[in-house]
Amino acid sequence: MLVVNNPLVLREQISLWRREGRSIAFVPTMGNLHQGHLTLVEQARSHAEKVVVSIFVNPMQFDKAEDLANYPRTLEEDCAALNAAGVDLVFTPTPEIMYPQGLASQTFVEVPGLSGLLEGALRPGHFRGVSTVVTKLFNLVQPDVACFGQKDYQQLALIRKMVADMAMPIEIVGVPTVRAEDGLALSSRNGYLTTAERALAPELARTMNWIAEQIEGGDHHLPSLVAQASQRLDNAGFRTDAIDIVDATTLESATDKSRHLVILMAAYLGKARLIDNRVVMLSA
């Protein structure tokens, strides 16, 4: 497995594979890898002959300097796991390499509409940072396929729209959320949980599933369901950040005609901000 941080070296290797007629799959990450990331790698391997993974803690998508500074960096362990998973190349650039003129002078990419909704409204600038860094990584790696987790539902929708709008010749593969046995969605941020908080954390998924069951059972008074779910989380020790039930395609408010919904959950438990989602299909 090659580990490189120089974009020129990366491009040389990509060009070599292209001359050999190899297909390339790409998995962008911020490191601190867990089984969810390795599942993305497995999916990537099934779609192409060569797999490239990037590890880059992207400062452009953090709205708090403290969060950026505290984000776990476990490069040695990550590379060992990726090597064992059969990855062909790991790209590990620094912020100075990715943004040589600094963030203030960096050209950015922004997807209108989706960038300002929901999570984007709570974290201004976050999705601008995501779309910019993903575009730059796509330009460097030039993959045929890129794999993203469905746990970050809005991010996946944003990447799909960006790729379509910009006519990028890349297939975007959404990979189902990987969960612990108790239902908690795997996330690098789970490492912020204390032992006691980790025991409480599955309540987020349980509450989400409760909402889905109510909707599927015929209760379509969504504001009431959101209020009850928020109270349920607060009673369990969470601090609810957002619960949204929206059209799964547009991510705009669901209407009486909406039949394809997604429940989007975000709540703090201690220092950790946990997110989850579930799609609900209603019969016509």
UniProtKB/Swiss-Prot annotation:
Binding positions for (R)-pantoate per the UniProt entry: Q61, Q155
Pathway(s): Cofactor biosynthesis; (R)-pantothenate biosynthesis; (R)-pantothenate from (R)-pantoate and beta-alanine: step 1/1
Signal peptide span: none
Enzyme Commission numbers on file: 6.3.2.1
Residues that bind ATP: 30-37, 149-152, 178, 186-189
GO function term, MF aspect, one: ATP binding
Alphabetical list of CDD domains matching this protein: PanC (cd00560)
Note: The reaction proceeds by a bi uni uni bi ping pong mechanism.
Name of the protein described by the UniProt record: Pantothenate synthetase
Organism of origin: Aeromonas salmonicida (strain A449)
